[in-house]
Every structure is written in C-alpha cells, then in structure tokens.
Swiss-Prot record:
Has the canonical translocation RxLR motif, but lacks the canonical EER motif, which characterizes most oomycete effectors identified so far. It comes from Plasmopara viticola. The keyword Signal applies. This is Secreted RxLR effector protein 15. Residues 1-22 form the signal peptide. The keyword Hydrolase does not apply. The gene is RXLR15. InterPro entries: RXLR. Belongs to the RxLR effector family. Its main location: secreted. Effector that completely suppresses the host cell death induced by cell death-inducing proteins. It comes from the Eukaryota. GO terms for cellular component: extracellular region; host cell cytoplasm; host cell nucleus.
Length: 136
C-alpha cells in the first residue's frame, strides 16, 4: 500500500510538472507572436518652414487629388487684407459694433503664430488710426 501511494504521488507530480511546462511554453509562443510586426511610427508634418521663400506662390496643404486645394490661413489673410476696401469694411463693422482700438488689439493678440501676429498687429494699428480719424 505504501508503494502504491508513493507511485501515485510520483505520477501526479510528473503530470503537474509536464502540464505546467506545456502551459508556460504555450504562453511564451503566443506572446512572441504579438511582438512580431510592432514598429514604432512617428507622425510627420507636411508643412515646412518657409524662411528663405521669396516667391508669392501659394502653399497648399491638401494633396492635388482632393480636387479643391486650399492655401494656408496666413496666405488667405494676406490676400484679403491686400484689398483696402475690405479692410475699410472690416474697420467700419468693428466701429459700428462699438469696439475700441484697445479691445481689438487685446482680442487679436491671442496667437502664437508669428505670421498671424504680424498681420494682427498691423490690423490693430490700422484700426487705431481709423478710430482716431473718426473721432476728429
């Protein structure tokens, strides 16, 4: 009877060890499958700095196959503000709404974009001159 118990204990121990090793090997195989094909990717911006760009060619941020290509906001602002009639209408709208030159400058000075900051500064200075002319 003692021999039978010892033999049963040995069989149970071997069965537990062999099934545990199979589970560990199986888990390792599955986890290594997940590691294959993982590649780190980085998002790249298509917009480039145009420091030395002297051309007035508009820069498009949509690919040509989209049909309608749109220029950057800064380029559209410069084009619209090149028309004195549109600027005058904008100043009249602000003046009729009761905005002071100080309020306009404060609201326009909320950007970190260097190109827009220059455009907005010129708008604020122009509106201050417009208000000064209207108050005389």
């Amino acid at each position: 009877m003692r021999g039978h118990s010892a033999l049963m204990m040995a069989v149970v121990t071997l069965a537990a060890v062999s099934s545990g090793a199979a589970e560990v090997a199986n888990t390792a195989a599955v986890s290594s499958d997940y590691l294959i094909g993982t590649i780190l990717t980085f998002a790249e911006s298509d917009r480039l700095l145009r420091v030395n760009d002297v051309d007035d060619v508009p820069v498009y941020h949509y690919p040509p196959e989209k049909g309608k290509r749109t220029t950057f906001f800064e380029d559209r602002m410069k084009k619209k503000l090149a028309n004195p009639e549109k600027i005058r209408r904008l100043y009249w709208k602000w003046y009729s709404m009761g905005y002071s030159a100080r309020e306009v400058v404060q609201h326009l000075d909320q950007t970190d974009n260097r190109e827009l900051k220059e455009i907005y500064h010129n708008l604020g200075v122009g509106y201050a001159e417009f208000v000064a002319k209207m108050n005389v």
